[in-house]
Regions:
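Glycine-rich, histidine-containing beta strand-loop boundary motifs that form or position
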Residues: 36-38, 60-64, 76, 153-157, ...
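Short gly/pro/ser/thr-enriched loop/turn and capping motifs at secondary-structure boundaries
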Residues: 41-42, 65-68, 158-161, 311-313, ...
Length: 979
C-alpha cells in the first residue's frame, strides 16, 4: 500500500538509502513498493535491483514538486510510463519553465493528486486523489466520499523512526537555509511518514474498501522491465552493424599502412586480430564514435590526447585516437578489451580546456539531445562541512562552530548542542546534497535516455543524467570521456604564438621525430622542465635528474613511479637504486629479466602484472587481466579469484617451479598490483610531455607566454614569469599601448596581460584593447580618458602599475594630470572626431620623484608579485654562503643559503608527524630544494611568500643535491618609502 517512498535522493528531504527501502519493507511484510523520489530519478535502477534481490515488486514513480509545493505523484505502469515521467521532468528542467499545476495527458501512468487542480469528477481514468491515514475520519463529511473510485491510500515513507524525522527536519533547514526554530510544518514531512506493521493501513481504511482496492489495483497493474544491458548504448555508427565493421576495418587497415608502412607484417596481424575481438564484443560503434569525435576536433584545429587503457589498442593508434604505439611499448590489447572483461572499454580523450565545450556541443548535435547527456556526480555531506551546516541550522555562533570543527575531541569546550551535531551528522554523512557534472563522461544511447533517467540542465548549458558513473556501469552504459586539461592549451597556443611572433609554422604532432631530437632529450635530462606538462613539479624534476632520464621509454617509467602508491611502497626508490647499481640485484626468474628488463625487474605497470602472470604461470592474457583487475579491487574473495589463484599454482607446479618460487612471485604480484599504473596512460602523458619539451627547447619565450596564458599549472604565474625571464625574455608590466587581455610577446619582450591586474574590471580591460585595435595607440593620458569610459579608481590602478610609462611621466606627474583630464561626464569618443578639443591650462608642478622601490611594492599589491628581482628588496646584502649551482661542491657541509619561496609539499611521516619539502630560487634565479623534518618544521615554519635564510646540511640523493634544514628565518624587505 506504499505508493510514495523516498530515498535520500529526494535531496535534503529523504533519509533512506535506496537499498534500505526494500529490505525494511520485506521485514514489514510488504510485497510491492512504489519508489518516487522528489524531482529525481538517480536511484531508479539501484532500487529495482535491490527489490529483485529481496523478492519485492519494484514500481517506479516521481513526486513532482515546484518550489517545495507538492503538485502530483506520477507512477509508471510500465517502461513507457517511466519514459513519460522522465520526459515531463526533463522538459521542465531543459526549458526552465515551471512544472504544470495539472499533469499533462500521460498514456502509461497513474497520477495521484493531493490538491486537486480541477473537480474530482473531471479526473481522467488514471488520475486519483490521495488520502492520508490521518484524514480518514474527515472523509465522512467530504464530498470526495461520493467518488470512491477516485481515491487511493497516500501514506508516504520518508524516514524510519523519530530520529530519522529529526534528521529530516535538519535536512529541510539546510535546504531552506533557516534555523530549526523557523521551520514551518508545511516545509517538511509529517512525523507519520514511516513504514507501518503489516495490515495497519488496511485496518485504518477498512470502512472504505474501494480505496484499498484502488490502491491495490495500481500496485497490481504496474511493472518495470528495466534491465542492465550493453544494448542501451548506441549500437551502430553507420546504421548497420556490418557496415560499421567494414568502415572500421577500412580505417584501421589504411591507418596501419600510414603509421607503420605498407609491409609491416606484425602491425597488420595485430590490427586484424584486434578487429576480430572488437567485432565479436560489439564495440565497432564505440570505436567509430570515438574516431568521429577526434576527427571533428582535428577538422577545426583542436589538439587532443588519447589516453587510458585505450592506448593499448593498435586500432586506436591507427585511427589517430591515440598517439601511443603499442608495439613500441609492448602494450597488451587484452588490458583494454577481452572477452572476460565485464566492464566496458574506456577511452580518455583530452582536449584543451578552452576547446572541450565545443567538442561536447558537437557530440550533442551529432547524436541527438534525446540520446546524449553528461554523467552526474553526487556531492555528498561530509567532514567539516556537515558540522558547519548543522551548526548554522541549530543557531550556533560561528566561534562555537569553529571550536567544534577545529577541536572535535575537546568536548569540554563544545557548545551543548555539539552532541546533536555529531549524532545527526553521522546519520546524514554521505547523503547526496546536490548533483553536479562529471569531469567528462558522456553517454550516447540507442533509445532516448528518458527510458532510464530524467535529464537536468546545468549552468554550462549541457544536460546531465541523474545517475553517476557507477549507476551507468550498473546499467552497462559505456561512457565517452571527453576531458580537458591545460597542457594541450599551452601547446596549441605556443604553436600559434610562434607563427605570430616568428612567422614559423611548426608541427608538434610528429611525436616519433620529437622523441629522437637530441636537444629535446638533453632538455629532459637536465630537468629544466618548468611549464612542461606532467614533468614540471619539484618531485618530477628531481626524479628526472636522479634517473638521468633522456628518452621516451624512461620517461614513461618515471611518469608511473612518481605516483603516490609506487613511491610510498618503496618501489620508486628500489627502481632508482637498480638503475644506478645494476649489479645490486638479481632477477627472480628469467621471465622477469625477459619481460621486465626495461624496468629492472620492478613491476611498474599494470601490464607488468599481466606479463608475469601470463609468461610465468601460463594463464592466458584474458585471465591475467581479470586477475589483475580483481587484485586492484575489492573482490579478492570472489569465486573467480580463487579459481584463477588455484590455476596459477597448478600451472606453476606443472612447469616444475619450486613452491617457494611460485609463492614469492604470487606475493610480488599481489603487492605490486595494488599500486601499479596503466602503462598506456603514462605513455600518453609522456608523449604530451615531449611536445611541451620540444617547444620549451626551441621556442622557450613563446612557450612560457602560452603557459602563463593557460593558467592552472603546478606553479604560480609569478614563477612562470620568472622562468620566461630566465629563458631570455624582457618582462614588461601591463601597458595600455602594448598589452592585450592575455599576456603577449613581441620579439623577446613579454608584456604582462591586463588580466593579471587583480583590481581591473574585465569589461574595462577588453574595452582598452578593442579601442586601441580599432583607432590605434593612445597618444596621451588625456587621449586615453577621452576614448575610454573609466572610473577614477580604475585609472589610478593603471597609473600605479605603470601602464602609461610611455608618456615619459612618472606616476605622480600622471596622478596630477589625471585630475585635469579625467571627466566622467564627457562623451567618450576617438580623438580624431573631437574638432573643438581644448588643451588643459598649463601649470607648474613641484618635483615629484618616485622612491627607489615603490614600483615593486605597487606591483606586489596589484599583480601579486614584483617584476624586479625580489632579492633587491631585502634589507640585508647577504645572499648566502653558496648558491644553488654550488651545492654539489659542499656535500655533507652545513651552509647558509638565501632563497625566495616557490612552493612546498606537506608530507605525513610514518609516525604521523608533518614535514615539508620546499623549493626556492637563489639570487640568480636557480632552483634549490629543501627538506624540513618535523622538529625543524615545528621550530622554524614557513611564513608565506618572501625570502628566507636557511641553515642546513647539503645532502645528495642519487646525484640530486638538496638542503636538510635545521634553522630558517624569513628576511625582511626594505620599507616602502611612501609610508
Amino acid at each position: 500500500m506504499y505508493i510514495n517512498c523516498h530515498s535520500y535522493f529526494s535531496l535534503r528531504y529523504g533519509t533512506f538509502a535506496p537499498e534500505e527501502l526494500p529490505s525494511i519493507a520485506k521485514s514489514f511484510g510488504v510485497d510491492a513498493l512504489v519508489f518516487s523520489d522528489i524531482n529525481n530519478t538517480s536511484a531508479a535502477f539501484q532500487f529495482v535491483r535491490a527489490c529483485r534481490a529481496e523478492g519485492i515488486k519494484p514500481i517506479l514513480g516521481i513526486e513532482f514538486r515546484q518550489d517545495n509545493e507538492f503538485l502530483y505523484l506520477g507512477i509508471a505502469r510500465n517502461d513507457e510510463g517511466w519514459r513519460e515521467l522522465c520526459s515531463l521532468l526533463t522538459v521542465s528542467s531543459i526549458s526552465g519553465e515551471p512544472l504544470p499545476k495539472e499533469a499533462p495527458e500521460l498514456q502509461h501512468c497513474y497520477i495521484i493528486y493531493r490538491k486537486l487542480p480541477k473537480g474530482v469528477e473531471l479526473l481522467r481514468d488514471y488520475e486519483y486523489a490521495g488520502i492520508r491515514p490521518e484524514e480518514v475520519n474527515h472523509l465522512y463529511s467530504s464530498y470526495l466520499k461520493n467518488y470512491p473510485d477516485k481515491l487511493v491510500i497516500f501514506s508516504p515513507v520518508t524516514f524510519a523512526d523519530q530520529d530519522g524525522f529529526k534528521a529530516h527536519k535538519l535536512l529541510r533547514c539546510i535546504d531552506l537555509n533557516i534555523v530549526i526554530g523557523k521551520l514551518d510544518a508545511k516545509d517538511c514531512a509529517k512525523s507519520s511518514e514511516v513504514f507501518y506493521p503489516k495490515g495497519h493501513l488496511e485496518n485504518v481504511f477498512q470502512q472504505y474498501p474501494h480505496i484499498i482496492a484502488n490502491t491495490q489495483h495500481i500496485l497490481d497493474n504496474c511493472h518495470t522491465d528495466m534491465e542492465a544491458t550493453k544494448f542501451h548504448n548506441r549500437r551502430t555508427f553507420t546504421g548497420d552493424p556490418d557496415d560499421d565493421f567494414k568502415l572500421l576495418t577500412k580505417l584501421a587497415v589504411s591507418g596501419c599502412k600510414r603509421r607503420f608502412g605498407e609491409k609491416h607484417k606484425k602491425a597488420m596481424e595485430r590490427t586484424l586480430r584486434e578487429l576480430k575481438v572488437i567485432q565479436q564484443m560489439g564495440f565497432c560503434a564505440y570505436f567509430l564514435i570515438t574516431w568521429d569525435i577526434v576527427r571533428y576536433a582535428h577538422s577545426v584545429g583542436y589538439f587532443h590526447v588519447g589516453r587510458g587503457s585505450g592506448a593499448n589498442s593498435i586500432v586506436a593508434y591507427n585511427l589517430n585516437i591515440t598517439d601511443v604505439d603499442p608495439l613500441e611499448l609492448d602494450l597488451y590489447f587484452e588490458r583494454f578489451i577481452n572477452p572476460h572483461r565485464s566492464s566496458p572499454p574506456d577511452f580518455d580523450i583530452d582536449f584543451s580546456w578552452n576547446n572541450r565545450d565545443d567538442v561536447t556541443d558537437y557530440i550533442f548535435k551529432r547524436y541527438g539531445k534525446e540520446h546524449t547527456a553528461l554523467l552526474a556526480t553526487y556531492n555528498t555531506f561530509k567532514g567539516k562541512s556537515i558540522i558547519r551546516e548543522l551548526g548554522k541550522v541549530l543557531g550556533l555562533p560561528k566561534a562555537d562552530i569553529d571550536t567544534i570543527v577545529d577541536e572535535p575531541m575537546a568536548v569540554d569546550k563544545h557548545h551543548p548542542f555539539a552532541r546533536h551535531i555529531f549524532k545527526y551528522g553521522k546519520m546524514i554523512e554521505k547523503f547526496p546534497n546536490y548533483l553536479s557534472i562529471h569531469a567528462g563522461g558522456i553517454l550516447i544511447s540507442e533509445r532516448p535516455l528518458n527510458y532510464h533517467t530524467a535529464l537536468q540542465l546545468m549552468p554550462k548549458g549541457f544536460p546531465i543524467v541523474h545517475f553517476d558513473m557507477y549507476g551507468a556501469e550498473d546499467l552497462e552504459y559505456h561512457k565517452y570521456d571527453v576531458l580537458s586539461q591545460r597542457g594541450l592549451g599551452h601547446i596549441k597556443d605556443a604553436v600559434d604564438l610562434v607563427k605570430q611572433n616568428q612567422g614559423k609554422a611548426i608541427d608538434v604532432h610528429n611525436v616519433a621525430l620529437i622523441k629522437e631530437d637530441p636537444n629535446v632529450k638533453a632538455q629532459l635530462k637536465s630537468g629544466h622542465c618548468i611549464g612542461c606538462f606532467y614533468i614540471e613539479s619539484p618531485a618530477m624534476r628531481g626524479l628526472l635528474h636522479k634517473l638521468r632520464c633522456d628518452n621516451y621509454v624512461h620517461l614513461v617509467a618515471a611518469s608511473s613511479i612518481i605516483r603516490p602508491g609506487v613511491a610510498q611502497s618503496g618501489m620508486m626508490r628500489e627502481y632508482i637504486q637498480r638503475f644506478h647499481k645494476p649489479d645490486s640485484y638479481t632477477y627472480l626468474h628469467p621471465v622477469f629479466e625477459e619481460h621486465l628488463g626495461e624496468t629492472y625487474g620492478v613491476m611498474v605497470y599494470q601490464e607488468d602484472v599481466m606479463k608475469i602472470v601470463h609468461h610465468f604461470s601460463g594463464l592466458d592474457l584474458d585471465e591475467s587481466d581479470v586477475l589483475r583487475r580483481i587484485m586492484t579491487g575489492k573482490k579478492k574473495s570472489s569465486d573467480t579469484f580463487y579459481r584463477l589463484q588455484e590455476k596459477y599454482f597448478r600451472n606453476c607446479k606443472e612447469r616444475g617451479y619450486p613452491d617457494e618460487l611460485s609463492k614469492e612471485v604470487w606475493r610480488q604480484i599481489e603487492s605490486f598490483s595494488g599500486y601499479s599504473f596503466c602503462k598506456a596512460h603514462s605513455a600518453s602523458f609522456a608523449a604530451e610531455s615531449f611536445q611541451s619539451l620540444y617547444l620549451k627547447t626551441y621556442f622557450p619565450l613563446e612557450f612560457m607566454t602560452a603557459v602563463i596564458n593557460n593558467f592552472g599549472g603546478f606553479y604560480s604565474t609569478e614563477q612562470y614569469v620568472h622562468e620566461a625571464r630566465m629563458c631570455g625574455a624582457k618582462i614588461e608590466a601591463p601597458c595600455v599601448n602594448n598589452s592585450t587581455y592575455l599576456t603577449n610577446i613581441y620579439g623577446t619582450t613579454i608584456y604582462i596581460g591586463l588580466i593579471h591586474l587583480a583590481n581591473l574590471e574585465q569589461k574595462l580591460a577588453h574595452a582598452i584593447v578593442e579601442e586601441r585595435q580599432i583607432h590605434g595607440d593612445y597618444r596621451s593620458l588625456k587621449d586615453f580618458t577621452h576614448r575610454i569610459n573609466i572610473s577614477k579608481e580604475q585609472l589610478e590602478f593603471l597609473i600605479r602599475i605603470g601602464a602609461f610609462r610611455w608618456t615619459g611621466l612618472n606616476k605622480y606627474e600622471l596622478m596630477w594630470e589625471k585630475n585635469a583630464v579625467h571627466n566622467p561626464l564627457i562623451k567618450h569618443v576617438y580623438a580624431g572626431e573631437m574638432l573643438f578639443d581644448t588643451e588643459p591650462e598649463n601649470y607648474t608642478l613641484p618635483i615629484l620623484a618616485e622612491t627607489e622601490h615603490e614600483q615593486a611594492f605597487d606591483e606586489i599589491e596589484l599583480l601579486g608579485f614584483p617584476l624586479c628581482n625580489p632579492f633587491d628588496l631585502l634589507q640585508t646584502k647577504f645572499r648566502g654562503d653558496i648558491k644553488a649551482t654550488q651545492m654539489k661542491d659542499y656535500l655533507g657541509q652545513t651552509v647558509r643559503m638565501v632563497g625566495y619561496y616557490v612552493c612546498r609539499k606537506w608530507v605525513t611521516t610514518s609516525k604521523g608527524d608533518l614535514m615539508n619539502f620546499g623549493t626556492m630560487t637563489d639570487v640568480d634565479g636557480h632552483f634549490f630544494d629543501t627538506v624540513h623534518f618535523p622538529p625543524s618544521l615545528k621550530a622554524y615554519a614557513f611564513q608565506g611568500k618572501g625570502c628566507y635564510i636557511v641553515l642546513g646540511k647539503v645532502v645528495d640523493d642519487f646525484g640530486f643535491a638538496s638542503l636538510e634544514v635545521s634553522k630558517m628565518e624569513k628576511l625582511p624587505y626594505v620599507k616602502d618609502g611612501r609610508y
